[in-house]
């Protein structure tokens, strides 16, 4: 004889359960931003933009001039993990080269 467990809901034969559609949100995006300082050479900033952000020389120069004139410039917009990785790579490279260049991420 089969026993029924107490407090366990029983389904009728032929009942079809509907699967609820999951609404996935796009990931949060972050801007990677270089901050101006009076010591890091402009050519080093251009090299960083080319090496870590795949910018051509002309675009890298324009971003570098924005950093110089306005105090900061956006290098690119990425998901959180990619942005954090780029910030760490740039900061480490600048530190190893003896430059005080700062790179931060901001919510886009």
From Swiss-Prot:
InterPro entries recorded: ClpS, ClpS_core, Ribosomal_bL12_C/ClpS-like
Gene3D superfamilies, A to Z: 3.30.1390.10
Biological processes, Gene Ontology terms: protein catabolic process; proteolysis
Top-level taxon of the source organism: Bacteria
Function: Involved in the modulation of the specificity of the ClpAP-mediated ATP-dependent protein degradation.
Family annotation (NCBIfam families): PRK00033.1-5 (NF000672)
Subunit structure: Binds to the N-terminal domain of the chaperone ClpA.
UniProt family annotation: Belongs to the ClpS family.
Annotated PANTHER family: ATP-DEPENDENT CLP PROTEASE ADAPTER PROTEIN CLPS, ATP-DEPENDENT CLP PROTEASE ADAPTER PROTEIN CLPS1, CHLOROPLASTIC
Protein name, as recorded: ATP-dependent Clp protease adapter protein ClpS
Species of the source: Cupriavidus pinatubonensis (strain JMP 134 / LMG 1197)
Gene that produces this protein: clpS
């Amino acid at each position: 004889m089969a026993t029924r467990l107490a407090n366990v809901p029983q389904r009728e034969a032929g009942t079809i359960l509907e699967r609820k559609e999951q609404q996935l949100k796009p990931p949060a995006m972050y801007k990677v931003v270089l901050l101006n300082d009076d010591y890091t050479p402009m050519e080093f900033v251009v090299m960083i933009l080319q090496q870590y952000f795949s910018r051509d020389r002309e675009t890298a120069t324009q971003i570098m001039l924005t950093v110089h004139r306005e105090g900061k410039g956006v290098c690119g917009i990425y998901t959180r993990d990619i942005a954090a990785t780029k910030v760490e790579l740039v900061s480490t490279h600048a530190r190893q080269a003896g430059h005080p260049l700062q790179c931060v991420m901001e919510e886009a």
